[in-house]
Amino acid sequence: MQDFLLVLLSTALVNNVVLVKFLGLCPFMGVSRKTDAAIGMGLATTFVITVASAACWLVEALILEPLDLKFLRILSMILVIAAIVQFIETVMRKVTPDLHKALGIYLPLITTNCAVLGLPLMYIQGHLSLAMSTLSGFGASVGFTLVLVIFAGMRERLAQLSVPAAFAGTPIAFVSAGLLGLAFMGFAGLVHV
């Protein structure tokens, strides 16, 4: 139990996928203008990364390794992730059409999100077990969602303030992202691996 908690803390806070590994920067900057859209994107990404971590591990262990087809690893991962994203998009279109419309092009782009592809690949290459791979994927995606929602809140607040013209828009977003990264550096000593 303690190992699971350490994995969750280290993947969500200490080794944050956005702020430490620099994966998932496109949705981090693109979907973080509104908190509602950030929450929806974060939840969808959490589901996709968690399921993709398990599914890609299973494809690797049950198909690619026994048949010596490791050269098809990335292609097979993209296909698995695309199927999961299509499932999420279909469910979201039926259940929450407003959120589906708010996420727009970023929802199908989850397929090509480097965090969604990179994390399962890192877990497979790190020889993690199925449980640890899935748990690490869940923790990393929770960290992604946390950072995305916090950053969206910061950007909403900044939109209400009087920002100098030279810093308006993207420059102040980059400065804010840097400050958020500095804040998360405080978690660096939390987990010693």
Swiss-Prot record:
Belongs to the NqrDE/RnfAE family. It is an enzyme of class 7 (translocase). HAMAP family: RsxA_RnfA. The complex is composed of six subunits: RnfA, RnfB, RnfC, RnfD, RnfE and RnfG. This is Ion-translocating oxidoreductase complex subunit A. It is found in: Cellular chromatophore membrane. Its EC number is 7.-.-.-. The chain crosses the membrane at residues 4-24, 39-59, 71-91, 102-122, 134-154, 171-191. The keyword Electron transport applies. It comes from the Bacteria. GO terms for cellular component: plasma membrane; plasma membrane-derived chromatophore membrane. Keywords: Electron transport, Membrane, Nitrogen fixation, Translocase, Transmembrane, Transmembrane helix, Transport. Residues 1-3, 60-70, 123-133, 192-193 are periplasmic. It is a multi-pass membrane protein. GO terms for biological process: electron transport chain; nitrogen fixation. Residues 25-38, 92-101, 155-170 are cytoplasmic. Part of a membrane-bound complex that couples electron transfer with translocation of ions across the membrane. Required for nitrogen fixation. Necessary for stable existence of both RnfB and RnfC. It comes from Rhodobacter capsulatus (strain ATCC BAA-309 / NBRC 16581 / SB1003). Its main location: membrane.
